[in-house]
Amino acid sequence: MGDGSDAERSGGTSSSSALELLAQYEQHIMERGRTLEAIEGHGGERLGPTYEELVEENVQLRRELQGQREEIEHLRKTISLLASGRSGATVVEQQVRPEPSPSVRELALPPRSADRRKNTKNLSLAPVGHEVPSTDRLRVSPQEATSGAQQVPLLTSSKSAEILVSKSPDEDRHLMSPRKTISRSSSSYSNTLGSPATSVLYKNSRISITSPCKSNSTSKAASVLSLPENNTSTENAPHSPHRIDNELDLLTVEPQDGSRYDTERAGGPGPLSPESIVYSDSDLQEHQPSDLSSTTRTDLGKFRDMVDTTFNAEDNPTGSRDKETGTEMEIATLQNTPSRQHESSLVTSPQASRSSITTPVVDPTNTSEPSSLSAAKFGSMSTATSSNKRSKGMGTPSVEHSAKSYSQHSGSPHSNSHQSKKADIPLFVQPEELGTIRIEVISTLYHEPGNAASILFSVVDKKSSKEMFKFAKTFTRIAEFDTFIRNNMESLAVPPLPDKHMFASNVPVKVDSRREKLNDYFASLLYLSPLPFNPALKLAQFISTDPVMNPITGEFAKEGMLLVRKSKTLGSTTTWRIRYCTVEGSIMHLHDHMIDTDTIKLTHSTIELQANLPDDKYGTKNGFILNEHKKSGLSSSTKYYFCAETPKEREQWISVLTTLCDGPGGTAAIPSINSKSEASSLFEQTSISDSSYLGPIANLEAMDATSPTRPNDPNPVSLTSEEEKEVKRRRMKSFFPFKKLATTPTPYAAGNDNASIFSQDDDSPVNATNESGISRSLQSMNLQAQYNAVFGADLRSCLQLSSHPYQGKYEIPSVVFRTLEFLYKNRGIQEEGIFRLSGSSSLIKSLQEQFDKEYDVDLCNYNDKVSVTPGNENQGGLYVDVNTVSGLLKLYLRKLPHMIFGDAAYMDFKRIVERNGDDSKLIALEFRALVNSGRIAKEYVALMYALFELLVKITENSKYNKMNLRNLCIVFSPTLNIPVNILHPFITDFGCIFQDKAPMENGPPVNIHIPQI
């Protein structure tokens, strides 16, 4: 007994534990359910559609897709039937039935929407003799019952139209076997009777380009609008499916005598003959709803409830539904007539009443007569010809009515009209609105993963100049569009597209050229507005497809496509690479197809602008140079050449990069100025520092406080024209002795007749005569009173106009100081081909005129003040670069009316070179003695020091700039108008001559033959 009681107690304990666990589980389930309900109820408005709504929308889309596929298949079969028998023309007949009483009418849905309500897709025809439920039968009048025609019922839902296809007993022998039947879907009949899928008119743009970061609720609201064909605009639309009149197009096949098809001879039935619409039992059973699975039926049931609720709420606001009623209507007859006439008549036969169909209730004031059968499918609409006299005689009044209806309702979706073509896709811009926009090509280097398009467009509103949306295209798509436009606009001049091979090149000049040609092409199209309808509609469709969303910004300071190459690849024009560049912090990353190929540290880097020269051998356009600073010194810096697609884009990159680079003139430390450093050159150091190349005078901010020397006369007199300046300059230079001295061979110019002009002694009578003649001529010309320009003036006059201190002990003209300042700050001494490559001639001329008028121009900040007018963004010669500044310095030196060391000292230097022969050491020592003797004016010594120090630094960086001693002598010997054997020691022994250093033991020999020297 004890054991039994213990067992009972243990069993009761386990049962209670199980019950407690079940209670806890149920409590957990209830809490989870309440939590889910709270989440759905609280966040439904913010989190977007619920799962059930998404499922319903998915089911709806799947059904629409299936219906469209069946419709396409039916159209293909119809086309094949029409192609197989072209001997028959189409006759379309209509029967106008009296309008039923408003009390018994019901607002019927569009055919496709009505099908959705009943969740059935079976509108196939049953074979002859097949039993059909009485509810699906059409009411047949006694007159029809005695007509002797066999009736084939068309199975539809109770809410949809019920149609009987009649044929005479004479045609029974032409029935096809069940194997040759054609299954026709509901969508095919919907197209014939007014399918809303072909009646879409996007009167206004209802799809907006939204950012991908918007909420799901917004996306859901726009999801239905983004459907390609099933969106209908029912508000005030002239062809809305809710405004269909009680007239419908009907079909009847009635072969004419002598033109009846013989199926045995023809091998098949004629197009749209009764044989082509006979259906077998298997086909009928195949579409029965009972074949659907239980899951499908459940989903369709839910979808049916949703559609019923939606349409009841929209179409019947009062909540009451009228009982539907039927009106009797006839089945028109398709007659096979000779195909060569290609004509059909729209006639009404009062004797052809066959059946009734439910029609929608519409406002009598807004009713519009139905359009005729689509002319695109059954031929053009016209009155009957002599071959159709019988049909024409049967319905003459209705022919006039039909013609009137066609002319008035050409905008119907069933007519072959322009407006019906608007239903292809939703349009962001309507054809009639093309005159209010402009299309701009943003980039031809656009790349998006998974998208082959490489050309990015922007559609901008003309009035507000604001961007509406973007879209991307491939060149193939653009070429196809161009072919269509030219076929439809043969009489209009449309500029050609860029050649396809231009899109295979990455040379910046070609990239800019193809972008400009595309801009011209689309600008010309819009300029011709209003365009013919077909081209206008095609253009509207072209810009409304392949939209591009604006990316989410904020992660990088700047990002975009750039053309890049390094300095080591400058020998070839095929080395430009497309890179996606991003600036993150002080690092610039270069990506190639999502792979990080290069990383540039922007700290202490420098930026240079490149002029847009039409003859640039590297094809540079909208370019700039980024010199990456290395810790080991400037000699190991890396130079990157970048090119943007537009000047505006380059300015954006420059503005971002300059704030991140701490180059010369930026936050880099500047050495202090002391007496010792003032007396020495910056380049006594073994390596180039990060500070300005101007050395101790690099503290330009402090020096700006020292105003440049200006003449006392506030209104200096200048020449009236540039031609007069050039004439006077030539007249002055014609008096100097080195132009007229006799030729005597010298040790350094043996065998070089061109260099022997410097062999004349200064003690010779010729020289004395020339000097006296020069003085008298200069005094008689009184040039000083007239010539106050910088270029062409002597050194003393130029210093009086404007000057700047250099190295704390020299005074040099402002034009020389500004050019040296720009070259040192922008690492011009490392620029490849400096002083040999020419800059923008127009910009050099402009800078010369500014210096002549203002005497001092800040070249370092010149580009910040450049203003570009709209339309001139790509014009060359707008921005100052290294080659432009070096060309400006050469122009000033070339226009000096005297030698750089003065005309009086020329013969002294010449005798030293002749006396010492090949001994470069003695030549350097005697040059130094002459410079320090005081016989050469201090202004000449200052200019010599500044210029020759620059040339020394260029030779020290010859491995980067490719300008060795020989190349510099080739450039500056004619520029300074002095022979090479005098110029050479100033560069090779600069330290000995100007800085009291020991001379070089054996200087590098220079053997140059310069014609004119």
Curated annotation (Swiss-Prot):
For this protein, the record's InterPro entries field holds:
PH-like_dom_sf, PH_domain, PX_dom, PX_dom_sf, Rho-GAP, Rho_GTPase_activation_prot, RhoGAP_dom
Extract the ranges annotated as region (Disordered).
Answer: 90-197, 258-277, 282-301, 307-421, 702-726
Comp. bias regions, Polar residues: 143-160, 309-319, 333-388, 404-418, 706-720
PH domain mapped to chain residues: 555-662
| SS bond partners | none
The protein's role, per its UniProt record: GTPase-activating protein (GAP) for CDC42 and less efficiently for RHO1. Negative regulator of the pheromone-response pathway through the STE20 protein kinase.
Q: Where is this site: Arginine finger?
A: 836
Tell me the ranges covered by the Rho-GAP domain, including all copies: 799-1013
Q: Which Pfam families match?
A: PH (PF00169), PX (PF00787), RhoGAP (PF00620)
Entry's localization field? Cytoplasm
Please give the biological process terms from Gene Ontology that the record holds: establishment of cell polarity; negative regulation of Rho protein signal transduction; septin ring organization; small GTPase-mediated signal transduction
| Name of the protein | GTPase-activating protein BEM3
Q: Which UniProt keywords apply?
A: Cytoplasm, GTPase activation
What is the species of this protein?
Eremothecium gossypii (strain ATCC 10895 / CBS 109.51 / FGSC 9923 / NRRL Y-1056) (Yeast)
Give the record's GO CC terms.
cell cortex; cell tip; cellular bud tip; incipient cellular bud site; mating projection tip; plasma membrane; site of polarized growth
